[in-house]
Amino acid sequence: MSGKQLPMASKTPPALRPKPKRERLPSWFRTTLPSGEQQAIFNSTKAAVKDNTLHTVCQEARCPNIHDCWASGDATFMIAGKECTRGCRFCAVGTIKKAPPLDPEEPSHLATAVESMNLRHAVITVVNRDDLADSGADHYKKCISAVHERKPDVTLELLCSDLAGDHEALAHLLEGSPLSVFAHNVECVPRLDKTVRDHRASFSQSLEILRQAKVLRPDIITKSSLMVGVGERDEEITEALHLLRNAGVDLITIGQYLAPSDKHLAVDRFPEPEMYDVWAKEAIAMGFSGIASGPLVRSSFKAGLLLRKTRDTENSETMPGAYVYVARHENDTPTPLNGGVY
């Protein structure tokens, strides 16, 4: 198994273990802060989010790419609240048993923010709302429609929950939707569901949501994401990629899990950056339309750029720190758009 392997977990009961010392991150996780014009764009993005009383997954999930994305004018908006009704062990988003009512003004606020930021591509993600009969599907649809009505030229990507496996709610959400991308993350390999995710989530349930989305709307690109460093083996990543591709998933991202705090799931390993290139090439060989793979890659990281590259409308901009491949035509050899820069 390549990369930096962390010590095996102790069999001592958690309550009796000494508090572990957090491992120093490998050198390839170094990032730079924005300055000059990029700092000004970062500040403008931050102000647009604050002025419209919105939440972003960039902030709530403590994403390591926040400076890079916000300095480029990119942001992933989080709707339906800032706290989730589930408690996955990897996630920095807050958990709440009884969520507050949905904000009826949120669709309008979201549309205003997207308009003011002059985005080409907007990613909208959600918290789980198991307290709602439709898991929030109708609210998500209203938010998407509001943005499209205000800015029809902006491509839209929804990073959706599993909607508690409700295919009727999914059908309502996707009917007539202007979405370019429907994304839902399986997060980890199937064997690790109980270790990593909330007990109400599973790889199989997530896979069926992705499969059904493609059946309902074959014109919409489907997308998912895998984390590494949560206890998986290299071959399990390959197996999970096969399952996702067989479900009709078009785009995939692979990135390193980083524990938000000592209270979250501990990091198991740090694969070497070159391993992400291996997975990327495997994914394209399986028939995925595109992949971004690298330690700092997250499902929404430069999502618009990956979409444009997949559609062959963007060839100049690169994704430093990621191995990015797209299949230009069926049965083509993989086309590397840029190598990893660390």
Tell me the role of every PLM-derived stretch.
Residues 119-125, 178-190, 247-258:
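Non-cysteine beta-strand/loop elements that form the S-adenosyl-L-methionine
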Residues 95-122:
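Conserved alpha-helical substructure of the radical SAM core
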Residues 96, 127-129, 161, 186-189, ...:
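Short, ordered loop/turn segments at secondary-structure junctions
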Residues 80-87:
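Short pre-active-site segment immediately N-terminal to redox-active cysteine/selenocysteine motifs
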Residues 1-76, 80, 92, 108, ...:
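Auxiliary Fe-S-binding modules of radical SAM enzymes
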Residues 164, 182-203:
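Acidic/histidine-rich catalytic cores of soluble enzymes
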Residues 122-142, 231-236:
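Conserved glycine-rich "GG(E/T)P / GGGxP" loop and the immediately following alpha-helix
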Residues 130-133, 190-196, 260-266:
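A short acidic, helix-capping loop that chelates divalent metal ions and anchors anionic groups
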